[in-house]
A protein has these predicted regions:
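Repeated scaffold domains used in trafficking and secretory/extracellular systems
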Residues: 2-16, 42-56, 87-100, 126-139
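Surface-exposed loop/turn elements that mediate protein-protein interactions on large endomembrane-trafficking
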Residues: 1-4, 23-45, 67-88, 108-126, ...
């Protein structure tokens, strides 16, 4: 078998017909309902730090080895191609892939970028937020210990 020596710690469905598996050395994307077939098999030679996904994209975080940032987020489409690579230094709490947006945040910092990797915002929160989530358009829900705020990005 192709996966004889692979450990596959992560498996998820993007939609009814598309799923993916992340092994220690590869990303495999499957298509088809009843009998899924491998549509992409991407070999990876770096250790994956974490995995994020939505219905159309898969994000893999690696430690950056180029010195550009602490981390590198590679965002793959369902064909297994890297659509963008985003370098960042923030120790992230969560990464959200939503529509054409990438949101990387922790309690005190946030980075917003589009799927082309263009940063739209990179800054600090005045209030520590426990949760930061997109609502619609340029509006976001920010939940702190004291309040629930709506933030609008320009």
């Amino acid at each position: 078998s192709d996966y004889a020596n692979a450990v596959i710690p992560f498996l998820a469905f993007l939609d009814n017909d598309t799923s993916f598996a992340v092994a220690d050395n590869r990303l495999v994307i499957y298509g088809g309902g009843q009998r899924p077939k491998s549509v992409a098999d991407v070999l990876l030679n770096e250790e994956i730090q974490s995995v994020f996904y939505n219905s159309t994209h898969i994000g893999l975080v690696f430690l950056d080895t180029t010195g550009t940032g602490k981390y590198r987020l590679d965002v793959y489409n369902t064909s297994g191609q890297v659509e963008t690579s985003l370098f960042f230094d923030m120790d992230y709490k969560d990464i959200i892939l939503q529509n054409e947006n990438i949101i990387i945040y922790n309690e005190t910092q946030c980075l917003l970028a589009n799927m082309s990797g263009v940063e739209r915002f990179n800054g600090d929160f005045e209030t520590p937020y426990l949760l930061f989530s997109p609502i619609r358009g340029n509006r976001y829900l920010a939940v702190s210990q004291e309040s629930i705020d709506t933030i609008e990005m320009r």
